[in-house]
Amino acid sequence: MNEGGESFPSETVAACRMPDEKGTVLIVNGFDRVSAPLSVRADSLAGFYTDIDGGVPDRQDISFIGAQHVFDMQMAKCEVDSIALGACACDYETEVIGGNTFDYPALHGRSVAAAGYSFCSASVRAVERGEVSPDGYSAVDLILGEQRSTTIGRGVTGYAFKTFSPELQAVLRRYMAGGGALFVSGSYVATDLWTGGEASDDDRRFAEEVLHYTYDGSRAAQRGRVRVVTSHPGFSRDEYRYVNEYRPDRYRVESPDALRPAGAGAFSVMRYVENGRTAGVASEAGGTFVMGFPFESIESDVQRDRLMRDVLDFLLK
């Protein structure tokens, strides 16, 4: 607050010291994206493809009224609103749509503390710049949410919001080479490294060598349900539900990733209930657990606490 008024809310970080802690986790918020939905313009089609990437509002959106259903450029001059280029549904006309609330370290942290671990948190920029180091922490929980390489406006400034920047990759490589443990979750953890606007061979090698997964497709599921399928004794055989529809208090997960284990000892932990595609991959030898949907999108507090306990105990046993 100053003479110019009140500034916009900033990113929220959190910390907690637990008595008789099992260890200390560094929670890194790598989800700072705010953007419009994916837009496409070709010779005959143009519009917003919200089922692939519905964009990320800044906390809340009151302008979205429904998904576009007319993309045909030949309808650009049509005078009938319902069938003209850009026509969309009106089923969310009076609804508030949830977006990025920039406070996910606190939400993750509550589950970390419930599992008996202390935690600190930092922005991904602080980690990339070397202001915060993961060295000395028992594990790192990297929040990626709906982060993905995205053009801003007309795209004249290039891409922003890459999931794993070269700087972050370098930090995580060093940390994992020193025996670290890493939990990663997000909708585009594989899509962005394989088909994103800035994807490279180095990105794919990083995913395979450090994170121990490969890409098995986007838009992997529509029903918002995953089930633990591994026989590993460290994981509870539960079903989890994540937010897959528009709500005022949570962002929607419209296009989760399907993963495939990579490297010796990597295995599937979770599968999407509707089709059996892999939703979560773990590597005991590599010290990683990666999910193709965001941890914070799991609806139930009890389910989040249970999953975080299982993940940390698996990584740090």
What kind of region is each of these model predictions?
Residues 69-201:
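Helical hinge/lid and interdomain linker segments adjacent to catalytic or ligand-binding clefts
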Residues 1-4:
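Beta-strand-rich modules
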Residues 127-133, 221-227, 277, 298:
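A short acidic, often aromatic-flanked loop/helix-cap motif at beta-alpha or helix-coil junctions
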Residues 13-102, 114, 181, 194, ...:
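Extracellular ligand-binding/catalytic regions of CAZymes and related secreted enzymes
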Residues 147-255, 266, 273, 307:
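A glycine-rich, often tryptophan-bearing local segment used as a flexible ligand/cofactor-contacting loop or short
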Residues 123-125, 130, 165, 231-235, ...:
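Alpha-helix initiation/capping motif
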Residues 6-10:
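A structural signal for beta-strand boundary/capping segments at domain termini and interdomain linkers
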